Amino acid sequence: MSSYENHQALDGLTLGKSTDYRDNYDASLLQGVPRSLNRDPLDLKADNLPFHGADIWTLYELSWLNAKGVPQVAVGHVELDYTSVNLIESKSFKLYLNSFNQTRFDSWDAVRQTLENDLRACAQGEVSVALYRLDELEGQPAAHFHGTCIDDQDITIDNYQFSTDYLENAASGEKVVEETLVSHLLKSNCLITHQPDWGSIQICYRGRKIDREKLLRYLVSFRHHNEFHEQCVERIFNDLLRFCQPEKLSVYARYTRRGGLDINPWRSNTDFVPATGRLVRQ
C-alpha cells in the first residue's frame, strides 16, 4: 500500500465508483490528482525536481459531431508537462472524452483547442494536443524499445512485494558505461481500484554498471504495488538515482491501454527524446 492511498485528495474521484456516462460536452468531468501526493514522500520538491519529462497520452476513442451532425473520429496525442500541479486521473479523462460524442464542433481545431484548454485547467500546467485522422496512422508497424532486454535471466523469484533493497549495491565497479536496458515485465496496480497495469520500461543511463539481476528483481517487486503510472515512473527514476547514482538517467514506460487510453510517462535528467510509436501490446 502507498503511504497516501487513503489521502483525502483522492476522496472525490469517480475512479472505483459507479458512474453515469454523459455524451454531451462537460469539462467538469475531468479530475486532477496532486503530483505532490507521491513526490512529498520521495522528498521531491516542485522547485528543485531532479528530472524533466512529460506524461504522453494516446486517445483511441475520440469522437464528436461536425457542424452538420456527421460523426468524426480521431486519434489524439496529448503531452502533459511534468511541472503541472496535477496529473490527470484516467477514468475521469475517459468520461470527459465520452462527453464529446454527441456534441457539435465547428472544426477539428476547435476540438483540439477545447481539449488543450480543459486539460490545462485541470492539470494546472502546460499541455499540448494533436489530433490525427485515421488514414494518417494506418499501416504503421508496432514499434519496439531500443535497448537490451533483461527479462530472460535464469533466476528464481518468490517475493513480489515492493522493495528498494534490491538496488542496494546494484551499481559496482569504477568503469563508466552507457547503456539502455529494457523490460516488459513491469506490472503495478491502480492506486484506487488495484486493477493491474501492464507496461514496458526503458532505462537509459551513463554511470557505473547496474547489476541486471538486481534491477529485474526491483522492477518485478512492483507487482503488488499500488500507484498510478506516472507515480511509478517517478519512483523508479528516484530510486535508481539514489541507489545507483548515474551521471545521466532517463526512465520511460509505455503502458497498455485501458478505456481507450494509454499513458506513457518519461522522466530524464539529460537530453532525451521519447519514441512515441505504440508497442506491440498497445
From Swiss-Prot:
Catalytic reaction(s) noted: 7-aminomethyl-7-carbaguanine + 2 NADP(+) = 7-cyano-7-deazaguanine + 2 NADPH + 3 H(+)
One cellular component term (GO) for this entry is: cytoplasm
MF terms from GO for this chain are: preQ1 synthase activity
Q: Which Pfam families match?
A: QueF, QueF_N
NCBIfam families the record matches: QueF (TIGR03138)
Task: Name the family the entry cites.
Answer: Belongs to the GTP cyclohydrolase I family. QueF type 2 subfamily.
Cited function: Catalyzes the NADPH-dependent reduction of 7-cyano-7-deazaguanine (preQ0) to 7-aminomethyl-7-deazaguanine (preQ1).
Protein name per Swiss-Prot or TrEMBL: NADPH-dependent 7-cyano-7-deazaguanine reductase
What high-level taxonomic lineage is stated for the organism? Bacteria, Pseudomonadati, Pseudomonadota, Gammaproteobacteria, Enterobacterales
Q: Which gene encodes it?
A: queF
